[in-house]
Amino acid sequence: MARLLLFPSQACVDPGRHLLLHPPVSRPRAVRSGPPPAAPRRTGVVSLPGRCPPPLCWNHHPFLPCRSSKRGWVVFASENVQEISSHLPRKDERRSGNLLLRFSALPYCTMAWLSTAQLAQSSVGEKLNMVYEVGELFELGIQLSYLLILIGLLGAGTFFVIRQVLVRRELDLSAKELQEQVRSGDASATEYFELGAVMLRRKFYPAAIKYLQQAIDKWDRDEQDLAQVYNALGVSYKRENKLDKAIQQFQKAVELQPGYVTAWNNLGDAYEQQKDLKSALKAFEEVLLFDPNNKVARPRVDDLRPRVSMYKGVPVKSEKR
């Protein structure tokens, strides 16, 4: 059986014979009275509603009409299927073309929208990834800086601890050797002084006072060098809060060596602790005579001068201990 090709104008084509059926446009639609027509047979021709299929004209010209005397059908014979589209109504052609354009443009618009959305999403994702990476790098830098600071602090602390341990060990070894010499009775005044200085650095003040006093008793060298022994003995008394004895030792030290600025500073500090501001100011001024840029005496003089001028003429009792 031949297949049919239907068009919007309700014409049909029989591929077997290349027939084009089209109802006459100029003739009015006839109204038929009587019983309804029988169902058309499958002859490769489709009839219009209310009309019977016309007889086929096989031997006519491909595009010359063949009129039926009974039903008024017009039959066109076509040898080429491509020529059929030229006989379609122009309005139907334009409508079909518009529909095809719309439906064909829809997938392209959808794809363009999807691609734009994907690009926007990818750009946003890239920005978020960049921000996240920058945040990670910043956090990593902070952690590394904290780690370096911690390592530096630990290194500095370790250095000071090791240094203190080494100093303490050296002092212990020195004290041990000096004590052995003192026990043997062969120790000199210098060795007693060294042992007293070691005990002073180890903060064993009573032992330091004992050995320094023995060094003064056995001193047989230059008296100016003895000023250092008196100064160390005064520091030991001062650490024991025995300010009167400390001042006596400092005075002996500056008597033996007038330019001994360390003993003068210690003497001024001891007077200031006793609230004897005038004597303290005098001691610090003596330091500036020998060392005008002394970092210990200069600020103390600047602080004591206004205080002494304010209390001038008012007796200030010193606290004796």
Swiss-Prot record:
User: Where does the record place its TPR repeats?
Assistant: 189-222, 227-260, 261-294
Location in the cell = Plastid, Chloroplast thylakoid membrane
Q: Main location per UniProt?
A: plastid
* Transit peptide, UniProt annotation: 1-29
* TM region positions: 98-120, 142-162
Give the matching SUPFAM superfamilies: TPR-like
List S-S links within the chain.
none
Name a GO CC annotation attached to this entry: chloroplast thylakoid membrane
Output the InterPro entries linked to this UniProt entry. Answer: SGT (IPR047150), TPR-like_helical_dom_sf (IPR011990), TPR_rpt (IPR019734)
Q: What happens when the gene is disrupted?
A: Pale green phenotype.
> Which function does this protein serve?
Nuclear genome-encoded factor required for the accumulation of photosystem I (PSI). Functions as a PSI biogenesis factor. Cooperates with PSA3 to promote the stable assembly of PSI in the thylakoid membrane. May target primarily the PsaC subunit.
What name does this protein carry?
Tetratricopeptide repeat domain-containing protein PYG7, chloroplastic
Organism lineage: Eukaryota, Viridiplantae, Streptophyta, Embryophyta, Tracheophyta
